[in-house]
């Protein structure tokens, strides 16, 4: 997870993109092996702005209307933050739960000022599932300016995804 896209590194990946603003699109590449799912977020910087990726995973594709244990929120900014069964889990009892490293997943963080690519790898073991061909998972992405203020901006894929409702997320088929 170095934040550098080597020649051919992502040629075998699926890709989606979503608009942030006119002329600003974020592209997300995804691929996997038997142990990990890998993501590459490109276009996280534009005209002096920076966005930070979040990955929402429903590994058993339960498509519940509200969060349940086993559904993951993974956030990459100056630290890695995660929630199992809840989004936006930054602290508990006044103590930060975010760190530079987390068991079962990794990313190139904190991103340097010039970092334009965020790479993430998540183990299937972290998600509590084993890989099997043609498995389907619930999946959504968002990028946020991570200000922590009321006006914090967030952009989603799929566009209709709601962070609080796994039922609204997309479905990924891992072949």
Where are these regions (language model features)?
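Structural preference for beta-rich elements and adjacent junctions enriched in aromatics
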Residues: 1-175
């Amino acid at each position: 997870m170095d934040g550098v896209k080597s020649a051919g590194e992502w040629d075998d990946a699926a890709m989606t993109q979503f608009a942030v603003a006119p002329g600003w699109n974020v592209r997300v590449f995804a691929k996997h092996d038997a142990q990990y799912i890998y993501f590459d977020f490109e276009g996280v910087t534009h005209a002096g702005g920076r966005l930070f990726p979040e990955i929402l995973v429903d590994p058993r594709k339960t498509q519940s209307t509200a969060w349940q244990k086993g559904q993951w929120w993974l956030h990459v900014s100056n630290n890695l933050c995660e929630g199992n069964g809840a989004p936006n889990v930054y602290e508990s009892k006044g103590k930060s739960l975010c760190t530079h490293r987390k068991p079962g997943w990794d990313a190139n963080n904190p991103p340097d000022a010039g970092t334009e690519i965020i790479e993430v790898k998540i183990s299937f073991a972290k998600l509590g599932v084993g890989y099997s061909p043609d498995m389907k998972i619930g999946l959504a992405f968002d990028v946020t300016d991570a200000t922590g203020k009321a006006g914090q901006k967030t952009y989603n894929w799929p566009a209709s995804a709601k962070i609080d409702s796994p039922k609204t997320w997309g479905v990924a088929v891992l072949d």
